[in-house]
Design a protein with these regions (language model features):
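Boundary at the C-terminal end of the N-terminal hydrophobic targeting segment
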Residues: 20-30
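A short beta-strand-turn-helix
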Residues: 28-44, 72
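C-terminal cap of thioredoxin/glutaredoxin-like
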Residues: 5, 63, 130-214
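Acidic/histidine-rich, surface-exposed loop or edge segments in extracytoplasmic proteins
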Residues: 47-52, 185
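Soluble periplasmic/extracytoplasmic beta-strand elements of cell-envelope proteins
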Residues: 45-48, 79-82, 172-174, 190
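Structural alpha/beta surface segment adjacent to cysteine/selenocysteine redox centers
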Residues: 42, 50-133, 138, 206-211
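Bacterial N-terminal signal peptides
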Residues: 10-21
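Bacterial N-terminal signal peptides that target proteins for export
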Residues: 1-12
Length: 214
């Protein structure tokens, strides 16, 4: 189980600094497949736990993620990982997560992710299959993957992992060292909500400054 060292109040948000996370949580796991952006050797990893039906998650996608990509992810400083946190056990949120995973099985996870969070989106079984067609996916394989609800266990595993970090809503974020993970000197930072870019930048810059050789 995790140990929180302290709560830090900043001008923008309250943060929990986490010395050690759940034992089975890593910066990137084998089940992340194509749900990772950025360089493998980026010193920091930012994990998002999210639901495609969550309004605040969409706010992060539209307003904050593009700035993080330009400033930290594309420059090799941060690796970004998307993990699922469906807020219900069934329904459109779960179906959307399955659709994205099925697209990921054909190498188009981020294309589907962006479509699901995009303008004019519809979230229902028919729209997921239409999106798959427009993305050029193998329709037979996608339909079979979606109808069989493949990847469900991995999706709910992500949610259980988020709960063990202390999250019980979306979105939630964990910022941590990519290789070493949380340590006493450089604890992980739990960011509970869709805060503005400046809040993420403050924590990323602070953690980067603590790394060896910085």
């Amino acid at each position: 189980m995790r140990r929180a060292s302290l709560m830090r109040i900043t001008g923008l948000m309250s943060l929990v600094l986490v010395m050690a996370g759940p034992a089975d949580v890593s910066a990137v796991s084998a089940t992340d497949d194509g749900r990772v952006q950025g360089k493998a050797d980026a010193p920091l990893t930012l994990i998002e736990y999210s639901d495609f039906t969550c309004g605040y998650c969409m706010k992060f996608f539209k307003e904050t993620l593009p700035k993080l990509q330009a400033t930290y992810i594309e420059t090799g400083k941060v690796r970004f990982v998307y993990r699922d946190y469906p807020r219900a056990d069934r329904g459109v949120g779960v179906e959307a997560a399955v659709a994205a995973r099925c697209a990921g099985a054909q190498g188009r996870y981020w294309a589907m992710h962006d479509r699901l969070f995009g303008e004019g989106r519809r979230l229902d079984s028919g729209s997921f299959k239409s999106a798959a067609k427009s993305l050029g996916l193998d329709q037979t394989e996608f339909g079979k993957c979606f109808d069989e609800r493949r990847h469900l266990e991995s999706i709910f595993q992500d949610r259980r992992e988020a709960n063990r970090w202390g999250f019980h809503g979306t979105p939630g974020f964990i910022l941590m060292q990519t290789v070493a993970g949380p340590t006493e000197k450089v604890p992980a930072v739990a960011i509970p909500g869709a805060f503005p870019f400046e809040a993420f930048a403050e924590e990323i810059d602070r953690m980067l400054s603590k790394l060896p050789g910085s």
